[in-house]
């Protein structure tokens, strides 16, 4: 998610789940080719498995960007065909590509020629006045013919005009049954569902109905304690750290970030929702929001915020 799933966010999320695939922010192919590669592509070994999400519509550019990214060691390269923002549309990529499946096929074929890891596609079920019942299977069939075997389908249409990106995540109705149908019609493909999933319980239910995976975005960001802690149970792993453990596991990373010239709020802005719905959550957010942006702020701010949580928990227990 753009402006959200940066390296700091991914490191934080990895403290809660060892198995879930983490995705970068979308990076455009021209940015990878011409921009500051280390800043855009660097990630830590602790983040694996991690996927790079690319935006673009020029097969040559996407191939070059994939070739560059290959040397960084990502576990997956994902082409975004689902983002509806005006900025993305003006570059002729994102959700607008749902109207051009043959071009998407050309793009992924070029990317696969430069990749030694899976190339995947994230898409919508359709855009504007398209009929998803007809458009989505045709899109999957066309792109799969170019060698892609893994699709993440956001189970909503995108309206390219008249709705903001936020509205496009909320107003178009969800159609989970259509995505489930696609798995039945294309059993050879890996089909993952995105959109409207806010809990591990929902994820388990969808997986039990035959889907290969579930992508959870904003719910995992805003309420990571409920969505990510325990997620490894989906793989049969008994790994569910306590929230306080997660915070303490972040402290060495934060100290290293600060020692390298970084600012505290660059990391802690992703941690605000960790205690969502629990006693002390408000105090946690208040301390981090008020103090992490100050010059010279260090891990003592995080310790102070955590004390607000533990203090409230002890007060209620007493």
Predicted regions and their residues:
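Hydrophobic faces of well-ordered beta-strands that scaffold small-molecule active sites
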Residues: 22-24, 50-54, 77, 119-123, ...
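Short secondary-structure transition/capping segments
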Residues: 33-37, 89-92, 132-133, 163-166, ...
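Pocket-edge positions in alpha/beta enzyme catalytic cores
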Residues: 54, 95-96, 171, 238-239, ...
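Active-site beta-loop-alpha junctions enriched in small/polar residues
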Residues: 1-3, 27-29, 55-57, 82-84, ...
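Glycine-rich, positively charged N-terminal anion/phosphate-binding segment
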Residues: 4-75
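Alpha/beta enzyme core
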Residues: 11-12, 63-93, 101-189
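Short, hinge-like loop/turn segments at secondary-structure boundaries
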Residues: 39-43, 95-97, 137-139, 168-171, ...
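Alpha/beta catalytic cores of nucleotide-metabolism and tRNA/nucleoside-modifying enzymes
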Residues: 2, 8, 106-109, 113-116, ...
């Amino acid at each position: 998610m753009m402006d959200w799933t940066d390296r700091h966010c991914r490191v934080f999320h990895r403290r809660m789940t060892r198995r879930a695939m983490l995705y970068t922010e979308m990076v455009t192919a021209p940015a990878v080719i011409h921009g500051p590669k280390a800043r855009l592509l660097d990630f830590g070994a602790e983040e694996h498995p991690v996927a790079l999400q690319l935006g673009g519509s020029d097969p040559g550019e996407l191939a070059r960007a994939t070739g560059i990214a290959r040397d960084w060691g990502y576990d997956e390269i994902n082409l975004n065909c689902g983002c509806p923002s005006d900025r993305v549309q003006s570059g002729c990529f994102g959700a607008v590509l749902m109207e051009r499946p043959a071009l998407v096929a050309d793009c992924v074929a070029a990317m696969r020629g430069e990749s030694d890891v899976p190339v995947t596609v994230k898409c919508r079920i359709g855009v504007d006045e398209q009929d998803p019942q007809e458009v989505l299977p045709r899109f999957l069939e066309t792109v799969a013919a170019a060698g892609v075997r893994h699709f993440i389908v956001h189970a909503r249409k995108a309206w390219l005009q008249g709705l903001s990106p936020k509205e496009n995540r909320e107003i178009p109705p969800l159609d989970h049954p259509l995505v489930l149908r696609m798995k039945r019609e294309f059993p050879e493909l890996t089909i993952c569902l995105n959109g409207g999933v806010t809990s591990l319980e929902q994820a388990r239910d969808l997986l039990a109905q035959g889907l290969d995976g579930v992508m959870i975005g904003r719910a995992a960001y805003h309420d990571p304690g409920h969505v990510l802690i325990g997620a490894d149970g989906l793989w049969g792993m008994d790994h569910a750290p306590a929230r306080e453990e997660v915070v303490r596991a972040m402290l060495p990373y934060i100290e290293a970030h600060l020692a390298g010239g970084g600012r505290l709020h660059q990391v802690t802005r992703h941690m605000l929702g960790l205690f969502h719905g629990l006693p002390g959550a408000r105090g946690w957010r208040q301390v981090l929001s008020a103090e992490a942006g100050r010059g010279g702020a260090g891990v003592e701010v995080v310790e102070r915020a955590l004390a607000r949580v533990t203090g409230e928990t002890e007060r209620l227990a007493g």
